[in-house]
Amino acid sequence: MPAWVVPSALELDDLYSVARSEYDAPRGNRPQACGIVGALMWVTGDARVGPVTGRPEQPVTAAVATAECWAARAMGHSSETPEWQLKAACTELGVAYWPPNVELIDPEEGYGVYQTLSWLLRWLDGYRGGSVPPLPLPQRHLDGSTVTADELGVGADQPASSAPSRAASAIA
């Protein structure tokens, strides 16, 4: 795992599993989940090219990931992120400019990449300030074990999605 990745390896495994489940679900958001999985595979070296630009740099550095995040963000906000701004960001980061490749990935997949890289980098200018994973992750105890529905007080008549968030659990 690259040293610049802020979330733990366990959180990355959880996100990968949740995204794969979302992709396989009949009504899941497949493009977003595909973008999430693509970003995780690229960052860990399991995919050789950037998911949005096709940039071939490996290993992925924080600067390269930030440039890819800019490109992913531009896919969903093309009118708000002109090409000159992407080029300027790459220059500031000291990496080569690679434009978003609309034939490589669709905008919803690009948004999943943007969300994921923002979170991995804890990029303040990114999706939700880089502090929120792109999909809800399972809650865990300090020892890493998963919190059960019984421990959350989720009954058969109460959906698991109404369970308190990690942040709420940490405050309590």
Show which residues each predicted segment covers.
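Compositionally biased accessory segments in Actinobacterial proteins
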Residues: 1-172
